[in-house]
Each structure stands twice: as C-alpha cells, then as structure tokens.
A protein has these predicted regions:
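Acidic, low-complexity intrinsically disordered tails
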Residues: 1-19, 682-691, 725-761
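Charge-lined substrate channels and their catalytic hotspots, especially those that engage the 3′ end
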Residues: 2-306, 313-358, 390, 395-400, ...
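A generic structural motif
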Residues: 92, 141, 156, 171, ...
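A short macromolecule-binding patch
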Residues: 107-117, 184-189, 668-685, 733-734
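Electropositive polyanion-binding surfaces
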Residues: 210, 236, 240-243, 250-679, ...
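Eukaryote-biased detector of low-complexity, proline/serine/threonine-rich segments
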Residues: 362, 705-708
C-alpha cells in the first residue's frame, strides 16, 4: 500500500508504509535539487530495511529508464538540468514566451517545451522571440502544455537571423548566395544589395523578401573574407555558432592600459629554474614546471614539484570589461587556421605569458610527493617568477633521450633529469590510481600558407606530453583540495560514471565478444582498462576503444562535486590554464581569497553566481568543440573536392538505422553511406552490436570495420561527404535479429530505394 504524503517536502506519514513508484517519481520530478537516496529516505521516513528496499526500487526505476543519475541526484530520464540555456521561439495564446533547450540529445526524443515566467521588477530584461537565455527551470507536472516553467537569469545578445553563404556570380552576371546550410534555398542578390562582395566571398546576408514563386531575395550584410585567398573556412563555424571573435573597444582599451605587475605581496621565485614545455608553435605560455629531489630524510626517494601558473587574476579584475568579455567567451577556441582567444593579445601573449627571461606574476603550487607517487602535502604561493627556458615537447624529449641541443644541454642535469625523476614517481601513483586509459590518437591538420590542407598526421605521444599532463592534473587536484578544506564554494570539473542505460548497452555489446563488464557500484575505470588490455593488439581493439568511449559521460563544470570518473579522482578543478579557460580564473580568484593572497579574490557576488557561471562555460565548451569539429570537416571536404569518384580505404566510425558513417584514417574526416545504397538485402540495425546486417544473408557491417569506399558526393561548405560501399558485407555471428527493437522503431532501416539521399552527420 502506498504511503500518503503530507503537503511538505519532508513527508510525515505513519510508519509501516512504503511509497509507490508513482510517488517516488513525483517527488523526484518536483524536487530536482534534492532527490538523492538520503533525501528520499528522509522525505518518506524510511529506515532500516525500508532503506534497502528504497535502494532496490530506485535501481529498478533506473533500469527501466524512468530515472537517471545526474550529479549524485536522481532525475526523471530526459529531464532538464535545474539551470539551462534556452532558445525563445514563440508565444502561447496568453502571450507567455515559449522556449526549448538550445541543446538536446536526439536519443531523448522531442525537446521539452518551457514556458517563461514574466520578469519581476522594472529593470528586468525581457527576452524576445529569437533570443537565447540562461534560466532556472521548474517542472510543471502537467500532462498537457509546457513541461517546465522558467525564470530568466540572463539574456544573451540577440541573435540575428542572418544566412551564411558563398557569394556566386553566374554566367549572365547575376548574383546568387549558396547557403552554407544545405537545407536552405539559394538566394538572389540585386547589384545594389551586394555590398562590395566578390565571387567566392563568404558573406552574411539578410533575407528581404520571399514570394510564392522564384528564389527569395537578400542583401549582403557583411563580407567575412574570401575562401580563395584568406583563411575563411573557420569563419563559417565562428558565425554559425555565434562565437564572439572581435573584442569590443572598451576591452581592448582596458587591456592596453594594463601595466606589468609588481613584487608587492609576492614571493620571489625568480631564481627557481622554472621552465615552460609547450607545442613548438605555442604563442602563449601559461604554465611552468620545476622539480627537485626531496632532501627530507623522512621522505626517501621523494620529490618536490612546483607548478607555476600565469596570474591572470592580477590583470582581469572581477566585473571589468575584460572579465565580462572573458565570461562571454568562456574559453579560447582553437581552429587549424586561427585561435579565437578568451583574452586580448596584450594579456594572453604578453603580460600573462610566461616568457623566457622575463619577470611574470604567477600563482604557484609546491607539492611534495613520496617515491610511490602519493602527494604528501602542498602549498600555494603568489609569486614573481622568471622562466629559465622555453622548450618544445620534442626538444625536451630529445634531450632526455640523449640528443640535447645547445639550449637543452646546459639544462639536462640540473633541470630536465629532476623533472623526469619526479614524473617517474608520479607515474607510479597514476598506475596505482588506475584512471581510464583509452587509446584513440588525435590527428593534427597542417595548413599551407593559403589556408588549404597540406597534410594530416597523428602527432607522436611523448613522455614530455605525459609529464606535463600529470603535473597539471596534480596541481588541479591540489586546488580543489585546498578550497574544499577551506569550505569554500568552487567550480569543479566533474565527470560522472556512465549512465545505467549506457552501461547496459555496452554490456550487451561486450557480451557479443565474450567480454564481461562489472555492474553498478563495482564499475570503475579499471573495469574498462581490464577490457581494453584484453583486446590490445587484436582485430577488435579499435572497435572496443570506440564503443567504450561512446559509453562515457561528458565532463562538465559544476558547483557540486561528484568526482571525476575518467581520472578516478574524488575532487578535481581546473586551475592550470586561466589564459584560455574562465573556469580556471574563477578557481584562481577563490584561492587568492581563501589564502589571503591579495585583495582581488573572488567576491560574494561571484560565489553566489557559480551555478550560472558553470552552466555558461559548460555551454561555451560544447560550442567550441562543435565549431572545431565542423571546421575540420569543412577543411577536409574542401581538400577532397577535386577527388570525386576516387576510391579510399576507410573505417566504419558510426552505425545508425539510416546507414553507416565512415572515417578516412589518412584524413580523419567522416562521410556517410545511406543504408538504401548498401545492396539488395534488407538491412537491420543491431544497436547492441553496433552493426547493420542483412535479413536474408546475415552478413553486414560493424563499427570499426575496415572497408573500401568511393567518394560520390561532396558539399565542402557543409563539410559533408557521401560515399558508396565497395566492400562486400561480412558474416556477423554476434548480431541478433531483435523483433522487439524493430517494433520500437530503433532497429530496422528503411526498405532500400532505387536512389539514396546523403545525410549530414
């Protein structure tokens, strides 16, 4: 029998009754910030054996897909987080604004409808249709109408409904716009609306008319650059994703007016041989490292590691024009042909860059490690430092490998060898910690001077890279530990364990390879590492690495700590890159305030806004990732535009009921093969095996298969390519025909048609 619940959140029903499934789901829906196991037990007054029953019931609801775990809280599956970015798109009959989340996973179905509450107060900024807002959302619990109401926290800049496209001149001299988004129709531009655009220019246009017949007309608003003569391809993604790339005059003025920091309130670390190790083409250097053996007899074989990070907080004060613009950008965005920095060059490449031989302010952490890599203690210091050397990764590695040059030779014994000695200890600690160790190399694009692709290669992963990475991880952990110890709020970098649904999907796939996967609370990064080690060197190594990667959650910023699953750390924050990440700047300010290192620490106001800031910078990070990925796709598609009808070796990189995505390993680019072009069989989508297999033959294609393909269609500005399959399907003994999946509409592809249509990923 279900317990009756009182009107309050606490629940004071009599003993001996347990809540029904519906009551549990209702509580989770109505209390999105309080629905942990402990809160549920308290709300329904469950004790002893009833708490064990509750745990089992919640697990069952998760297994059924009705609940999911998010930041140690239970939420209804497919629900919105409490703070979310929304796009306002319409009004209801009563005049209230309607919105949808700006990002929504396809697997969650249709995006929920959100009704925006009227703003309170005369000064409240009222959003309009077409604008983007940051809002707190509250479930309505209604079966019909909007699923949520929202209170607007911030209104972003109004997005212009402009079209991005290529300016074309036809043979008769008339002008056309070829939209970057292929679903949009071509546009006609009259000569007096061309705004000086030339053939091949990337332009932003405003549609000015659209009749019942003929193409719509437009006027050119902005000429963004020539695709023939300038590095303009990245500008497509910059504008498509509304990435701020031009600093306002007041921001530039503030940066230019900044003066070098003084020694006031700082320790003098200028005699410590800190060095920077970065990519050879790096322009800004925000971290420097030093290591020395620990002379304390109580720590035999130990090491003292110092990591110094550019003191950006000394120049970017909270609430300033620089600070507001940095938060708006969230992070620097890295394209193959350019960087869109978070901070102006005067700050990022000059005053804050830890240049060799020049005095620079820094926030340093000094850490003592035991011989087995355990961190024994650490301390933070606000310092003035002077980099002893600027080295590239390959240069430092060559010196350690016995090939020092004129610069690294004098540093080898006193500076480099102690660094590698400390890294050997930290590596032992990392091995004991057992973080997730995926082996999926990243590719780097090298461009010619004209901005076109020269080559694509996989950079070698050196110990020098791993050394810096591990030193930075330890510094980030120290920052989180210090702020937690001071009981101060902070923005964590959190990474949740895979959801139960993704775990089960992965478990089904691994079962086809006779590989077991631990369940629930026993699932740790080492569980995945054991599987990856078992398939290392086998035919399915790449396949298993890809599927394990897809099962993982996405790391985000959050004011609540749930730990970092991938790194296998209980607490983690970003501290080491304040030049290019706003999260790190917030952590710097928090440390300065917590440790009384200056008057420019975090304010009460910013502490109160950590929820909002975390949501903003998480969204900015996803925006940057999407823009970077799309730019690479466009560059590669442009590079291959002259190679239609050529054959390529490829690997299946994705499987859907609509067809196969294939990656060209030598270029790192993806294209699509529609299921309707695979042959005369009827292909069925096996989700658990990540495969399409023929109903008649039982043969098909699976994720990570090596195949031969032919390039048959290409749209360079959309970054889209369509291929034809040349390889014959192979037997797939692990695949299974699943009638119940097909009835849910997830498994079966469409019946083959005479002609397939390309689809953009």
């Amino acid at each position: 029998m279900a317990r009756r619940i009182s009107g309050g959140k606490g629940g004071h029903a009599s003993e001996g009754f347990r809540p029904s499934r519906e009551e549990l789901l209702a509580f989770v829906r109505d209390n999105p910030d309080q629905a942990g196991k402990r809160e549920l037990a308290r709300a329904f007054n469950l004790k002893g054996a009833d708490r064990i029953w509750l745990k089992d019931m919640l697990r069952a609801l998760q297994d059924e897909g009705l609940l999911e775990k998010r930041a140690k809280r239970l939420v209804r599956s497919g629900s919105l987080p409490h703070v979310v970015v929304l796009d306002v798109f319409s009004r209801d009959p009563e005049g209230l604004l309607l919105a949808r989340p700006s990002e929504w996973p396809d697997e969650n179905g249709a995006a929920p409808l959100v009704s925006i509450r009227p703003a309170r107060g005369d000064r409240a900024r009222v959003p309009g249709i077409g604008e983007r807002v940051l809002a707190k959302v509250f479930p309505t619990g209604e079966a019909e109408g909007p699923a949520y109401t929202a209170r607007v926290m911030k209104v972003f800049e109004k997005r212009r409904e402009a079209v991005l496209g290529i300016f074309r001149v036809l043979q008769d001299g008339s002008f056309r716009i070829e939209p970057v988004e292929r679903r949009q129709a071509e546009l006609i531009v009259e000569p007096d609306h061309a705004n000086g655009a030339k053939a091949g220019d990337l332009v932003e246009v405003d549609q000015i008319s659209s009749g019942r017949f003929g193409l719509p007309r437009a006027k050119v608003l902005t000429v963004l650059g020539s695709l023939a003569s300038e590095k303009a391809i990245s500008m497509i993604a910059i504008h498509a994703h509304d990435i701020p790339h031009i600093f306002p005059p007041e921001v530039i003025a503030e940066a230019e007016a900044a003066r070098p920091a003084t020694m006031a309130g700082r320790e003098d670390f200028r005699d410590l041989a800190l060095i920077t190790i970065d990519p050879a083409d790096a322009k800004d250097h925000d971290d420097a490292v030093h290591a020395a053996p620990d002379t304390d007899e109580a720590n035999p074989g130990g090491h003292i590691v110092t990591v110094a990070i550019a003191d950006v907080a000394a120049y970017v004060t909270e609430g300033s024009a620089l600070d507001r613009e940095a938060l708006r950008r969230g992070n620097s965005v890295y394209f193959p042909d350019r960087v869109v920095p978070m901070l102006p060059e005067r700050i990022s490449n000059d005053l804050c860059s830890l240049r060799e031989g020049e005095d620079r302010p820094a926030l340093a952490v000094r850490m003592t490690f035991a011989a087995d890599g355990r961190k024994l203690r650490h301390s933070f210091h606000r310092v003035m430092m002077r980099s002893a050397a600027k080295l590239a990764y390959g240069q430092a590695q060559a010196a350690i490998d016995g090939r020092p040059d004129d610069k690294t030779g004098p540093l080898l014994d006193a500076v480099l060898k102690p660094l590698w000695g400390a890294y050997a200890a930290l590596k032992r600690g990392r091995t004991a910690r057992e973080p997730l160790e995926l082996d999926l190399p990243e590719r780097k694009i090298v461009l010619k001077p004209d901005g076109t692709v020269d080559r694509v290669f996989v950079p070698e992963r050196l110990d020098a890279h791993k050394l810096i990475e591990e030193f930075m991880i330890q510094a980030n952990v120290a920052a989180a530990e210090t702020l937690e110890a001071k009981r101060l709020p902070l923005i964590y970098r959190v990474h949740d364990a895979p959801s139960l649904a993704k775990q089960e999907s992965l478990r089904e796939f691994l079962a086809t390879l006779s590989l077991p996967l631990a369940r629930g609370g026993q699932l740790k990064p080492s569980s995945f590492n054991g599987i990856l080690s078992r398939v290392k060197g086998s035919d399915v190594e790449i396949l298993v690495n890809e599927v394990v990667l897809r099962s993982q959650s996405q790391a985000i910023y959050a004011p609540e700590n749930i730990g970092h699953f991938g790194l296998n750390l209980r607490r983690y924050a970003h501290f080491t890159s304040p030049i290019r990440r706003y999260a790190d700047l917030v952590v710097h300010r928090a440390l300065i305030g917590a440790l009384s290192l200056g008057k420019d620490g975090i304010s009460r106001d910013q502490e109160a806004r950590l929820d909002e800031i975390a949501a903003l910078i998480s969204a900015a990070e996803r925006r940057a990732m999407a823009a970077e990925r799309e730019t690479v796709d466009r560059l590669i598609a442009s590079h291959l535009a002259s190679r239609l009808e050529e054959d390529f070796s490829a690997r299946v990189s994705g499987v859907t009921k609509a067809g196969l995505f294939v990656k060209l390993p030598q270029f790192g680019a993806d294209g699509f093969i529609p299921v309707s072009t695979l042959g005369d069989d009827y292909y069925i989508y096996d989700e658990s095996a990540h495969a399409l297999f023929g109903e008649r033959t039982g043969k098909g294609y699976q994720l990570a298969d090596e195949v031969e393909v032919r390039l048959v269609e290409i749209a360079p500005m959309a970054g889209a390519m369509r291929f034809a399959m040349l390889s014959e399907p192979k037997p797939l003994p692990g695949s299974k025909q699943s009638f119940h999946k097909s009835r849910r509409g997830r498994a079966r592809a469409q019946r083959p048609s005479p002609r397939g249509r390309s689809r953009r990923r």
